[in-house]
Amino acid sequence: MTISHIDPEYQANTIEPSVQQDWENRKVFKVADTVEGKHRYILSMFPYPSGKLHMGHVRNYTIGDVISRFYRLKGETVLQPMGWDAFGLPAENAAIAHKVAPAKWTFENIAYMRDQLKKLGLSVDWDREFATCTPEYYHWEQWLFVQLYKKGLIYRKLSTVNWDPVDQTVLANEQVENGRGWRSGALVEKRDIPMYYFRITDYAQELLDDLDTLQDGWPQQVLTMQRNWIGRSTGMEITFPSANTEIYADGLTVYTTRADTLMGVTYVAVAAEHPLALKAAENNPELAAFIEECRIGSVAEADLATAEKKGMATGLFVKHPVTGEELPVWIANYVLMSYGSGAVMAVPAHDERDFEFANKFNLPIKQVIDAKGADDADYSATEWQEWYGSKEGKLVNSGEFDGLEFQAAFDAFLAKLEPQGLANSKVQFRLRDWGVSRQRYWGCPIPMINCDTCGQVTVPEDQLPVVLPTDVVPDGSGNPLNKMPEFYETKCPCCGGDARRETDTLDTFVESSWYYARYASPDFTGGIVKPEAAKNWLPVNQYIGGVEHAILHLLYARFFHKLMHDEGVVQGNEPFTNLLTQGMVLADTFYREAENGKKTWFNPANIELERDEKGRIISAKYSGDGQEVIIGGQEKMSKSKNNGIDPQAIIDQYGADTARVFMMFAAPPDQSLEWSDAGVEGANRFLKRVWRLVASFLEKGNSATAIDKANLSKDAQDLRRKTHETIQKVSDDIERRHAFNTAIAALMELLNASNKFEAKDDNDVAVEREAITTLLTLLAPFAPHLSQTLLAQFGTDLTEATFPEVDASALTRNTQTIVVQVNGKLRGKLEVSVDISKDELLAQAKALPEVQQFLTGPTKKEIVVPNKLVNLVV
């Protein structure tokens, strides 16, 4: 073969565009809907087209690309697609701010970000690209909605929302700031409006059970989070008979997982929206005002534990089901109507929220559990202690039930109350049905029609998709679809009368719950996914994304897979066989603080740093004025802290390969990555050294390729061993461990070994050549542009290259290094045959000149640790 010559210096911004153009021209990464042989589907969570890539994107997509390129080298056909999660509130907000249609803003962002992603050098099949805001995509979302509605898996009910009376619009919880609308500043009201819900609770047990099938492929942390979110509990429904039958005949039913504490109930609390609360407020203006206050300031479930406890007595009473004692009914803001029956039996002695409430309103506290290892005399009704909430213990102050432990008490109360119709055992889930209606414009239209005669009617399938008008510029005052009769005026498909099209749109989590399936056949016009493509590519073999999506997105995608499975669209029960959750990208923060406490954050790119000899930052100045700023430590890159590093700037300065290598080397993928300019420079230096190694080798012009294994010098044996050990390690690190950082470390070691090696004959040259081409092939998943360019000099096309095979014979050692100690201190080293005898080893150890000078007295002991060391005790 002919050896080429290359520029002695690495010029990333010259080679990367030409390599990318080559991939595009040859459609290297295009795959068919169905393929023969080994194949694999690698997917990173698709981005929202916010306008610019951030470093979190770079990390996510580089991880996916490293895995994809690795399996391509292993001879597999790999599907790695890309698309855009394109509906959503940020586009509406940007449209309002810039007076531009969300569609225009979104597609301009997509064009820019697509260009950025291509510059990263991703091995993506761009022919499969789609945006979820196109009718070709959401047509099939609407089709599935219609099927599910007909099966009863979607229903409509009233739901409480945040209403901005000035902007005349519904606000998401995060758009409410201190009780006011984020844009108008108006006091937010609570309103009840009809919304559509998915019956995800019908699948709660299946969603829980099938987590067991993901045990080997998903992080334990994510499985635990999903289990907790689904929240299966076995408890008891207990009815407290009414003591005011003339007002409320039915009694009050509660659900509890702590039936063992029943004898400690001192009051019952209901949610503000509970029918009993509303009944009690009919002739009580003060109570009615309190209920309204609770409605306006409703607390999210996540904040319940820390929110201030508010309550008011209803004046009504219920009877304790065992003792008949009358217990007051209170309205409490920590009870949610959406959980259980909207009522709780309060046991202040053994529940922290009840304890806090009882102390605030001077309600009785009665201890009924004597926790194991706790002194009964230690119980204090004024200061909560951790053991008060323990299930481990025996009942006290509970009459005939004294001495029983948790399960025995549960069984005893059930046996006593069930025959009276006052209790039954019940399994309950924390998971709530999924409300998907959004009073927003920029989303998928809900394919429903409201008819005064026929009620809610699905849009006929031959009229799908219901297309969202795209030439709309929202002004922030409500959903513009409500002002567009050309959109909402329609005829009822059932009776033919005038009807109104639904103007709510779907939660954008719906689009991202099935997109992975659409990639298998994105141009298919006969359904969600072509059956043979679904059979070929699904489920996704490896899914990659941030751990912040551990609950909602992943749960909804699992739910949708089961819905599609039950519709016969896909096979199998789970969408993602393996999941890798990457950590956050952190960067230094810098700020100044005004007298009023307001902080102004400065981007690291505009900061001049002074470091100590260990590289730690000791002072920082803003380059705009030369004045000092406060060093805030490392935090997640974010707009709020202004500490994002623009990936484009890194690519422009160093090249995509440097950005990729840094991202993969700086930390294990599941841990936080600390941004470091020095680390980026280090990655770039590494690639420059690889380039120079190849340039130097090519310069010598020796084209020897055949290795004569029987006649290798010791140095050549060592380099071959290093080469094949590296193949073994990199393969294991990428495939099994996802330890990309240690894979790169191994490549750095192979580079060092290759640099030190001096070829003395053709056999040595062939060994060196093997080491270099192996290094380039193993580096290819991380730095594909550099690898493709350099491998071409050896006559290899990276796109057709295969992962090197390990030569087991290269791993065997004929010699070994033995450490020689005198009295436990290192005094010398020996290179000896692996089958040397003990006597010969001792003789050679004693003969070492650097050892002999310490052998001054008689030798008391000779210690030999096989294959490792000799220790002579004198």
Swiss-Prot record:
Matches recorded under InterPro entries: aa-tRNA-synth_I_CS (IPR001412), aa-tRNA-synth_Ia (IPR002300), Leu-tRNA-ligase (IPR002302), Leu_tRNA-synth_edit (IPR025709), M/V/L/I-tRNA-synth_anticd-bd (IPR013155), Methionyl/Leucyl_tRNA_Synth (IPR015413), Rossmann-like_a/b/a_fold (IPR014729), tRNAsynth_Ia_anticodon-bd (IPR009080)
Binding site for ATP: K639
Reaction equation(s) it catalyzes: tRNA(Leu) + L-leucine + ATP = L-leucyl-tRNA(Leu) + AMP + diphosphate
Keyword Ribonucleoprotein annotated: no
Localization per Swiss-Prot or TrEMBL: Cytoplasm
Stored Pfam families: Anticodon_1, tRNA-synt_1, tRNA-synt_1_2, tRNA-synt_1g
Keywords linked to the UniProt accession: Aminoacyl-tRNA synthetase, ATP-binding, Cytoplasm, Ligase, Nucleotide-binding, Protein biosynthesis
EC number(s) given by UniProt: 6.1.1.4
GO biological process: leucyl-tRNA aminoacylation
Domain of life: Bacteria
Motif mapping: 'HIGH' region: 47-57
Record bears the keyword Cytoplasm: yes
A GO cellular-component term linked to this record: cytosol
Motif window: 'KMSKS' region: 636-640
MF annotations from Gene Ontology: aminoacyl-tRNA deacylase activity; ATP binding; leucine-tRNA ligase activity
Family assignment from sequence similarity: Belongs to the class-I aminoacyl-tRNA synthetase family.
NCBIfam families according to UniProt: leuS_bact
Name of the protein in its database record: Leucine--tRNA ligase
Annotated source species: Acinetobacter baumannii (strain SDF)
